[in-house]
């Protein structure tokens, strides 16, 4: 890859803080140099405000197709569990081409919203009816194709899913597209690694779905396949899950995991909504990341993660769009803070210190935690030499940013403007979004609309 045209910004958020008149040069998808306090050059591409791109550490991209389709109350109590049945029905008719179309639409929206990398928690492995594809990586390849088409950075997280509940309970018939045994999962994982080779900079981790879906021996077998990469798991999302885990093991889910697995900085514990104080301390001590998905957790009525207590233990977190019911990086951060305000009846509760900007505190924590969760061995986070050239520019003309400078820009973006203030987005040095619109949006959106009309009709 040839050297790109230098980018010049009136102000940029660098690791040391806000810096004026910054030129960023890149080569081979990475930042090759950063010059501070320099006037724009004749060859520079000029912009106003630069931020690092945020990692999206947890996504089920195909669920973008469900957005807006589950907002009708069920006959009985409506919850995560009733929503899950609707999701199972939705995927019964979905083929590989349709799956890829849904993924591509979600990835376009992520890039337009300021996410430049995604951790795809990928558990749909088999054909309709549950028959394995001839290529066990068929649908992993469709995730990779959607990422390559849109340009988003990809960490693919193939999911091991074998059971319907704790203790090796039999799976439900509607879960058959997810299922494998350890040997079958090893084939899926190897095929997934082959599938992402054509995606620049892509990585692969592993994802035991949840303690509900794996037995202890299966968990050990799956972890042995991880090759030192990231490990993601759903955990303690629902109170019912906690109660059933206590009935099975006399331990809470996170408590059991910390006692029975070598949880470390490679791990991302997704949701962890109903963590106890001792569990929060344990996660922080192991330097694992908690993957928070505030919009999905609110949509599903999961509960509110105890973020204030976790922060007191210096816990690490990142954010994810999960079900992709709405894709907006700023709104995930805003809802995280606002949910804590409601719970604690206080303001600016996640600001890192007295006088600190809440927006900056949230942004930098999510940047560091997301980077660790997706690339735990990679050095260089944010806009620094050697890091991936993943960058977002904000529009100086957005009314919500008028008169703002420094950390007030982040506060205005997160708590007011959201994705409407995003101008351009670069991933690995390639400009994918300009004037707030992805360069492939028209074709991808048209394909998505055709697919969704068919799927909605088929699921009716």
Q: Language-model segments: which ranges?
A:
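N-terminal metal-binding scaffold of metallo-dependent hydrolase/deaminase domains
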Residues: 1-40, 49-50
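Histidine-centered catalytic micro-motifs
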Residues: 52-64, 230-239
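Active-site gating loops and adjacent loop-to-helix segments of metal-dependent hydrolytic enzymes
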Residues: 65-101, 127-136, 163-183, 239-264, ...
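Alpha-helical scaffold segments that flank or form the walls of functional sites
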Residues: 68-153, 183-199, 449-460
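Metal-coordinating catalytic core of metallo-dependent amide/deamination hydrolases
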Residues: 126-272
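His/Asp/Glu-enriched, well-ordered alpha-helical/loop segment
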Residues: 259-262, 266, 308-397
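C-terminal cap of metal-dependent C-N hydrolases
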Residues: 388-445
């Amino acid at each position: 890859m040839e050297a790109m045209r230098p980018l010049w910004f009136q102000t940029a958020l660098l690791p040391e803080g806000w810096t004026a008149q910054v030129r960023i040069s890149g080569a081979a998808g990475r930042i090759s140099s950063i010059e501070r306090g320099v006037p724009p050059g004749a060859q520079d591409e000029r912009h106003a405000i630069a931020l690092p791109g945020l990692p999206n550490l947890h996504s089920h991209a195909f669920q973008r197709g469900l957005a807006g389709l589950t907002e009708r109350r069920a006959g009985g109590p409506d919850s995560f569990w009733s929503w899950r049945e609707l999701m199972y029905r939705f995927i019964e008719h979905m083929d590989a081409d349709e799956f890829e179309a849904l993924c591509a639409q979600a990835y376009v929206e992520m890039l337009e919203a300021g996410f430049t990398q995604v951790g795809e928690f990928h558990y749909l492995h088999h054909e309709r009816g549950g028959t394995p594809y001839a290529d066990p990586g068929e649908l992993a390849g469709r995730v990779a194709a959607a990422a390559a088409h849109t340009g988003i950075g990809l960490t693919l997280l193939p999911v091991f899913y074998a059971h319907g509940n704790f203790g090796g309970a039999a799976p439900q018939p509607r879960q058959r597209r997810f299922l494998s045994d350890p040997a079958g999962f090893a084939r899926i994982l190897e095929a997934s690694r082959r599938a992402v080779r054509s995606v620049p900079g892509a990585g692969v981790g592993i994802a035991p779905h949840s303690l509900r879906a794996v037995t202890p021996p299966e968990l050990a077998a799956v972890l042995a396949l991880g090759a030192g990469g990231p490990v993601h798991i759903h955990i303690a999302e629902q109170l019912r899950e906690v109660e059933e885990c206590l009935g099975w093991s006399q331990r809470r889910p996170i408590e059991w995991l910390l006692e029975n697995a070598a949880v470390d900085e490679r791990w991302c514990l997704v949701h962890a909504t109903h963590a106890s104080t001792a569990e929060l301390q344990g996660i922080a001590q192991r330097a694992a990341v908690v993957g928070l998905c505030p919009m999905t957790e609110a949509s599903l009525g999961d509960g509110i993660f105890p973020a204030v207590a976790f922060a007191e233990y210096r816990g690490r977190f990142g954010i994810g769009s999960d079900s992709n019911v709405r894709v907006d990086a700023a709104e995930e951060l805003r809802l995280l803070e606002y949910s804590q305000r409601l719970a604690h009846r206080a303001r600016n509760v996640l600001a890192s210190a007295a006088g600190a900007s809440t927006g900056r505190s949230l942004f930098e924590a999510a940047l560091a935690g997301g980077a660790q969760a997706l690339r735990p061995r990679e050095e260089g986070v944010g806009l620094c030499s050697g890091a991936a050239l993943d960058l977002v520019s904000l529009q100086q003309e957005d009314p919500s940013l008028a008169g703002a400078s420094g950390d007030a820009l982040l506060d205005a973006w997160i708590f007011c403007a959201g994705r409407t203030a995003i101008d351009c987005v670069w991933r690995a040095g390639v400009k994918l979004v300009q004037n707030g619109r992805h360069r492939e949006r028209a074709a991808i959106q048209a394909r998505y609309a055709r697919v969704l009309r068919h799927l909605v009709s088929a699921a009716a």
